[in-house]
Amino acid sequence: MIQPQTYLNVADNSGARKLMCIRVLGGGNRRYGFIGDKIIAVVKDATPNMAVKKSDVVEAVIVRTRKAVSRDSGMSIRFDDNAAVIINKDGNPRGTRVFGPVARELRDKNFTKIVSLAPEVL
């Protein structure tokens, strides 16, 4: 459950380390974002000499949340942290690697490139 002002870890090698959500996309006055939702975020912490700099405004997709997500089978899944992957306008990740597990719901929302880069899909 990601809302504006929420801090997220970055699960790729684009150069950013921490993001702060400033907007949840989809719908006029949407309050919360869940796994697979796009957000607008600002980079709060970044690695030096990389593509993404501190205070850059970026678009990202949520890949892990602490809030449990229930599935149609009745199973629910939750992660240890809130994490996102920075994407470009086409929806492709800006980094070349994805760290940590990602949820299967990303495949349903057509983020297949992120799913293929991830080491584990839960």
UniProtKB/Swiss-Prot annotation:
* SUPFAM superfamilies per UniProt: Ribosomal protein L14
What Gene3D superfamilies does the annotation carry?
A: Ribosomal protein L14
Gene Ontology biological process terms, A to Z: translation
Please name the GO terms that the record assigns under molecular function: large ribosomal subunit rRNA binding; structural constituent of ribosome
InterPro entries reported for this sequence: Ribosomal_uL14, Ribosomal_uL14_bac-type, Ribosomal_uL14_CS, Ribosomal_uL14_sf
Keyword RNA-binding on entry: yes
Q: What job does this protein perform?
A: Binds to 23S rRNA. Forms part of two intersubunit bridges in the 70S ribosome.
What name is this protein filed under? Large ribosomal subunit protein uL14
What organism is listed for this UniProt entry? Nostoc punctiforme (strain ATCC 29133 / PCC 73102)
Q: Which gene encodes it?
A: rplN
